[in-house]
Amino acid sequence: DAIYIWTDTALFIMRFVGAPFTFSFQQVGTNCGLIGQNAAVEVDGTAYWMSENGFFRYTGKLESLSCLVEDFVYDDINTTPKQHINAGLNNLFGEVMWFYPNSGSGVVNRMVAYNYLDSSVERPVWTTGTLARTAWQDSAVFGKPHATEYNEDGTTATTDTNYVFGNQDGTSTYYEHETGLNQVKEGQTSAITASIESGDFDIGQQGLAGDGEFMMKIRRVLPDFLSQTGDTRITLNLRDFPNQTQASS
């Protein structure tokens, strides 16, 4: 029953109130403006967006999202082409994603995602990656998420009937996500290679004092992979001190 209006520094709510004023405008937050015009998404009545000051959501009250990868994102983001930064919703897995260019790129080449289903105040779930999508539509329209990827170096030959003849200004690939096991791009099919890496673990649970002063011994790993297809390799990166170079198992 409301429309969100962002500036680059604040959030306003517009509501219909009837005659004589028709609409009311209420400022509900400051220092939480939108980093780019496409950097917000709404999920079940909650708005999520990316600001120059971090990640936020509005549930009837303004909330700053605790983000463990915030420095990783904001220390290496190119905010000059703000119009390229865009948000996407993957409601099949409860994820809100933001696609952005890093400091060495003028086009989108990075992604940061927040899982709003699995997150809690004590344990927010964030991931980062190199998935580059310039536009995203969730599964509500096509049944699966659909998105595009832009390649600024892409060109087409004048004899290529799959593209605009003689294009020299980059190419875009149109994807359907969350379907099949392989990537199909430009007529080529290849297996999707996936990986995930966590942050460091230390012993500091169950009220133990001296956080970071205990040595951890790992005897075995019991994975719980559901519907696994193919082989999976688990690598443990070990170090005794925070600034020490990691050694892999």
Q: Predicted regions span which residues?
A:
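Surface-exposed extracellular loop regions of Gram-negative outer-membrane beta-barrel proteins
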Residues: 4-29
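Beta-sheet repeat architectures centered on beta-propellers
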Residues: 27-46, 52-249
